[in-house]
């Protein structure tokens, strides 16, 4: 990208998916810390973001960089006695990119090598590491619900305030990035 544009923004194009998931699981955060950068320089695309969404004592981080040699895990969850790591993304997108369509019974299904890994110490102090079978995703439910809302007048699956909150979060990230750049040039 030669110059910054919202419609090609790395934050808008990539963080939006994960922020959507976080908001659907946790709701409106109490507080958000934004770190959105243009590593290629001013007026170029924002190519790095690190957003920390706080929910009481829980912190959810959404981060990525255009400049990474390896992909980050999709999810890492830390607890007091263990952690869960899901390294790979939902298979639906990968299947669609290969024109492997939803009419196949195994569309979007993770193979064992894609499962998350739960590592923990139990109440007896014994270490465990086990694979966790992935939930089956289904993008088509969202599109069907959108159709049913528009055509049949059914209640929306995704409420307006959820979409507005996501846009507000993305816009605030861009605003803070631009504000930081403005202070650097004063």
Where are these regions (language model features)?
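Predominantly a Rossmann-like dinucleotide-binding segment in NAD(P)-dependent oxidoreductases
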Residues: 1-35, 39-42, 180
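Short amphipathic alpha-helical segments at helix-loop
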Residues: 2-7, 127, 131, 155
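Hydrophobic alpha-helical segments typical of transmembrane helices
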Residues: 17-21, 116, 142-146
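A broad structural signal for alpha-helix termini and local helix breaks/kinks
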Residues: 25-27, 55, 150
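Generic structural signal for secondary-structure transition and capping sites
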Residues: 27-31, 58-59, 82, 155, ...
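NAD(P)-dinucleotide binding in Rossmann-like oxidoreductases
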Residues: 39-46, 58-141, 159
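C-terminal helix-rich "cap/oligomerization" subdomain common to oxidoreductases
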Residues: 130-185
């Amino acid at each position: 990208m030669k110059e910054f544009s919202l419609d090609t923004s790395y934050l808008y194009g990539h963080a939006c998916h994960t922020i959507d998931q976080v908001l659907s699981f946790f709701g409106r955060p109490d507080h958000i810390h934004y770190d959105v950068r243009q590593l290629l320089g001013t007026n170029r695309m924002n190519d790095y973001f690190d957003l920390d969404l706080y929910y009481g004592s829980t912190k959810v981080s959404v981060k990525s960089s255009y400049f990474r040699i390896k992909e980050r895990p999709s999810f890492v969850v830390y607890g007091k006695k263990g952690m869960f790591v899901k390294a790979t993304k939902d298979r639906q997108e990968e299947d669609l990119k290969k024109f492997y369509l939803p009419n196949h019974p195994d569309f979007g299904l993770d193979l064992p090598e894609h499962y998350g890994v739960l590592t923990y110490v139990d109440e007896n102090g014994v270490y465990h590491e086990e694979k966790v079978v992935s939930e089956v995703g289904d993008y088509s439910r969202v599109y069907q619900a959108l159709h049913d809302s528009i055509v049949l007048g059914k209640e929306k699956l995704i409420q307006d305030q959820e979409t507005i909150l996501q846009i507000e979060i993305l816009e605030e990230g861009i605003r803070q990035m631009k504000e930081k750049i403005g202070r650097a040039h004063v």
